[in-house]
Amino acid sequence: MNKPQVPNSMAPNSMAPNSSVTVGNVVFDNKAALALIAGPCQFESRQHAFDMAGALKELTAKLGIGLVYKTSYDKANRTSLSATRGAGMDAALPVFDELRKEFSLPVLTDVHTEEQCAIVAPHVDVLQIPAFLSRQTDMLVAAAKTGKVINVKKGQFLAPWDMKNVVAKITGSGNANVLTTERGASFGYNTLVSDMRALPVMAEIGAPVIFDATHSVQQPGGQGGSSGGERRFVETLARAAVAVGVAGVFIETHQDPDNSTSSDGPNMLPLKDMPALLERLMAFDRIAKGR
């Protein structure tokens, strides 16, 4: 990996990112116990959100792994104009408030414009910057200024060391609570590849590193009018990433992904498969971190 020389300083007037970031009662730290970000691709309905959050809360409490619940009110980056995008902010944000109160769960959702950051922030614990927006300076600054924890997906077009500049835009805006997420790199047409060397490189930046096990198996635009995916490789990649050592894993899951209204059905893991996967990942994590 021909990594270019990167200056030691993050950026003028920038602070270093926090190496340990706490969201609710969940700790993300590259040296601490593995944490989980999980939930369905899209917010489908209040009832579905409650069903999923309840099931994941029960599972993670039993296993002893910290959970941040994720879901998206809008999926703006779709292959087709006619693709399902989600219920929208007006329907989803009040339910996010309910989920936080009912289940005592921190909630993560993604934002797609600068204006959305301040609107969404009061209703969630983590603002997520989508991969295709990871270089948008105004977007990163607007998110940072909300004071919320920021999770930035690494663009499929970025080298792992390029995330240093992304993180610097956030810390330089006064927010040191940043998570960085690896979700694969473009590899020719309609496919991604996960380079596990990216994980320690990103860890050198100083922020907790997350591995997105479900979007990493995505085949962008692979079905013509929508994206495909190879769900069978989710566990393979997740195990590899956790064996390297990460702060957390990101997994989209659903009771019936093949018949869901969500856009990432081919990538999502069936909810019934989550217990066995998490048990194995936690075992890998204990070995990787010598715990």
PLM region spans:
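Glycine-rich anion/phosphate-binding loops
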Residues: 42-56, 87-94, 228-236
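Active-site-adjacent loop and "lid" segments of alpha/beta metabolic enzymes
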Residues: 82-90, 103, 126-133, 189-196, ...
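N-terminal amphipathic alpha-helix/helix-capping segment at the start of soluble metabolic enzymes
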Residues: 1-7, 15-36, 286-291
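Glycine-rich, proline-tolerant flexible connector loops at the mouths of alpha/beta enzymes
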Residues: 36, 40-49, 67-89, 254-264
